Design a protein with these regions (language model features):
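A structural signal for multi-pass alpha-helical bundles of membrane permease subunits
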Residues: 4-296
């Protein structure tokens, strides 16, 4: 009798997994395989133009014929990912340390910090475009009161830092929540023992709290790195990929859907972006796992 119920339970488990597997297949596996296949063709999606298999010609074009453009996009991608990953985690860690303290309206400030995480990327991009626009934006107006021009917003020097800032602002809430959850798991007795030993608040945090939230650091660093390496929508809305913000995501989008619409070459860029993301994530995971073991 138990075998019958056990078999039914397993069947029920498999049935509940089917919808999720179908979604993963339709929106994960099939598009990924299709992109890989298209990267070996000269597909343009132009009606009447046949698609031909070209082998590694698209990849040769990127690494040989147009290496300078690919290199610039790769550098921009790594700069963007490094800036977002480092500062998003630093600010998130600081914010979580503050918001785990007991003070009036702490729940209000927690909600305020998390609010950007529920907004759409397009909404965030358009909102900050209006805020930072040099012609009539509120930031430009405030700077004009001090006799400072806001023309530097569109310069090569400031475009990337501003995009990094907006990306951090958009995702800081989620990062902070993960750190808050990690900090709340640290036993209060450990902090009390550190205080008795004469540890200051700063020393208490770095010597007691930080080593014990290493898993939270691993999660946040990997999510921030993976997310920023494949970001293109926010950059598209804010700068359209100009002023040194032409990341691999923007390079892929412009190649595939702008101008000649070379979907084959764009797919090749997408494959390389995916490979880069996998490599960076694996390296970070291996390093951070070692750090966790060393701290435990």
């Amino acid at each position: 009798m138990s075998n019958v119920f056990g078999g039914r339970q397993k069947s029920l488990i498999y049935l509940t997994m089917i919808p999720g597997l179908l979604v993963f297949l339709l929106f994960g596996i099939i598009p990924s395989v299709s992109t890989l296949v298209i990267s070996f063709t000269d597909y343009t999606a132009i009606p009447g133009v046949p698609m031909h298999f070209v082998g590694f010609a698209n990849y040769v074009h990127l690494f040989v014929n147009n290496f300078q453009g690919f290199k610039q996009s790769l550098v921009a991608t790594l700069e963007f990912a490094a800036g977002v990953t480092i500062f998003q985690n630093l600010f998130g860690l600081w914010m979580a340390n503050v918001l785990t303290k007991r003070f009036p309206a702490v729940n209000f400030f927690r909600t305020l910090v998390f609010m950007p995480a529920v907004l759409g990327v397009t909404v965030i991009g358009l909102m900050w475009s209006l805020i930072l626009t040099p012609s009539g934006g509120p930031v430009a107006y405030i700077l004009s009161l001090f006799g400072t021009s806001s023309a530097f917003f569109g310069s090569n020097t400031w475009a990337m830092p501003l995009v990094i800032f907006v990306q951090i602002w958009a995702n800081l809430g989620f990062t902070t929540v993960v750190y808050i959850a990690g900090i709340n798991t640290v036993p209060h007795e450990f902090h009390e023992a550190a205080k008795i030993d004469g540890a200051s608040g700063w020393t208490n945090f770095w010597k007691v709290t930080f080593p014990m939230i290493a898993p939270s650091v691993t999660v946040n660093v990997i999510l921030a790195a993976a997310g920023s390496l494949r970001t293109y929508d926010l950059i598209y809305v804010l700068t359209d990929g100009v002023h040194n913000t032409n990341t691999l995501g923007m390079y892929m989008f412009n190649t595939a859907f702008e101008g000649s619409g070379n979907l084959g070459l764009g797919a090749g860029i997408g494959v390389l972006q995916f490979v880069l993301t996998i490599i960076v994530v694996l390296v970070l995971q291996k390093y951070l796992n070692r750090r966790e073991e060393a701290m435990s």
